[in-house]
Amino acid sequence: MTTPPQAGVFPAILHETHADEFVQPFWDAAKKGKLVSARCTNCGTFRLPPAPFCFECQHREIEWVELPGTGRVYSFVIVRHALAEMLQPVVPYASGIVELDGTQGAGSRMIVNFVECDPEKLQIDDRVEAVFERVNDEITVVRFRPSK
């Protein structure tokens, strides 16, 4: 018998990852409570999500850059209807896009879930900060909450 999820907490099964060589450093950093992004060594464009080539110049080499873990709400949606029964306890919740501080270019935004907030009070341009939710020994998920 499985324990039902708590309100606002997504079931662990939704966090299974199958990281490849391009994204593994992101997950390794998250386990340490750090937000990182790949950056093109040729033109400086950020690659989030990490990809095998640069979105701007198609260069292949990257460097991993630690980001401050802050940003602003660029866009969001409030999910009010569970798409699966296991999600019923967590609705409503907010998902959206954060424009990350310390980045520029095509990969400067990240799709996220917002936590520790009333979704109805979330606003475009709100300042937010990363929080790291340890799901298990292998997976730590990056979420965002309103800045304090």
Residue ranges of model-derived segments:
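A broadly conserved sequence feature marking short terminus-proximal activation segments
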Residues: 1-35, 147
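Residues immediately within or flanking Cys/His clusters that coordinate Zn2+
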Residues: 34-37, 51
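Short, cysteine/histidine-rich loop/knuckle motifs that typically chelate Zn2+
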Residues: 39-42, 53-59
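Short functional micro-motifs and their immediate structural scaffolds
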Residues: 48, 62-63
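Short coil-to-beta-strand transition motifs
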Residues: 63-72, 124-126
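Glycine-rich active-site loops that engage anionic ligands at enzyme catalytic sites
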Residues: 74-116
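Well-ordered alpha/beta subsegment
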Residues: 103, 109-148
